[in-house]
Amino acid sequence: MFSNAFTEKAVMAELVAKMLWEIKAVHFRADEPYKLSSGMASPVYIDCRKLISYPRIRSAVMDFAAATILREAGFEQFDVVAGGETAGIPFAAMLAERLGLPMIYVRKAPKGHGRNAQIEGNMPEGARVLVIEDLTTAGGSMFKFIDAIRAAGGMVEHGIALFYYDIFPEARGDMKSKGVDLHFIATWRNVLSVARELALFDDKTLNEVEAFLDAPLAWSAKNGGVGALADR
């Protein structure tokens, strides 16, 4: 279980950003933007799934996740930890272990045979569920799992993402209006700060990334992507 040693939030954010660069989980490509599932064009891309392949790094990140939840939500606020199919599942298992809690996972859709279950594992009626994802942009994907948990009788008031895009100022407020507080460890601003500190890219690339973070939809539209996001 977790040792309850709390590292300062800013230090955790910087360390996670450095870890992501170290394992080459983040990429900047301003001259040939990535196309995200939302249809946005983006000069940045992240693959948090790579974390599971680096034991020392994943252990530190999960310690930070536990510290974030205990500090911001409390010690006795949850009965179950839930991960979404598929990226959230290993992180849910590791966080549940640290918090000393049961774990469930949520399918993207009912499996269509047998019990036709969408939630796997034991979730008692009224259980207070903490949902974890590897990353979230505006919370939309997380809410697919939250809605399924609520429909099955669980209570969800908190979610945590190891990495939060933090490019839409209204996103956390939108989640709050739907009854969920979003917690996170690191953001693109932290990653960009480390890239500048270590001079990982030329100024032109770094400035383009910053322009995207300042006005993501305008940057997307200018570079061949959508200029507005579909409603959840």
From Swiss-Prot:
Cofactor(s), by name: Mg(2+)
Q: Quote the record's binding site residues for orotate.
A: 137
**Which Gene3D superfamilies does this entry report, sorted A to Z?**
3.40.50.2020
GO MF terms listed in the record are: magnesium ion binding; orotate phosphoribosyltransferase activity
* Pfam families to which the protein is assigned, alphabetical: Pribosyltran (PF00156)
Q: What is its EC number?
A: 2.4.2.10
Catalytic activity entry: orotidine 5'-phosphate + diphosphate = orotate + 5-phospho-alpha-D-ribose 1-diphosphate
Q: Which domain of life is it from?
A: Bacteria
Q: What pathway is it annotated to?
A: Pyrimidine metabolism; UMP biosynthesis via de novo pathway; UMP from orotate: step 1/2
One record GO biological process: 'de novo' UMP biosynthetic process
**InterPro entries (UniProt xref):** OPRT (IPR023031), Or_phspho_trans_dom (IPR004467), PRibTrfase_dom (IPR000836), PRTase-like (IPR029057)
**Where along the chain is 5-phospho-alpha-D-ribose 1-diphosphate bound?**
107-108, 111, 113, 133-141
Q: Which key words are in the record?
A: Glycosyltransferase, Magnesium, Pyrimidine biosynthesis, Transferase
**Coiled-coil annotation: which residues?**
none
Family of this protein: Belongs to the purine/pyrimidine phosphoribosyltransferase family. PyrE subfamily.
User: How does the record describe its quaternary structure?
Assistant: Homodimer.
What is the role of the protein in this entry?
Answer: Catalyzes the transfer of a ribosyl phosphate group from 5-phosphoribose 1-diphosphate to orotate, leading to the formation of orotidine monophosphate (OMP).
Q: What is this protein called?
A: Orotate phosphoribosyltransferase
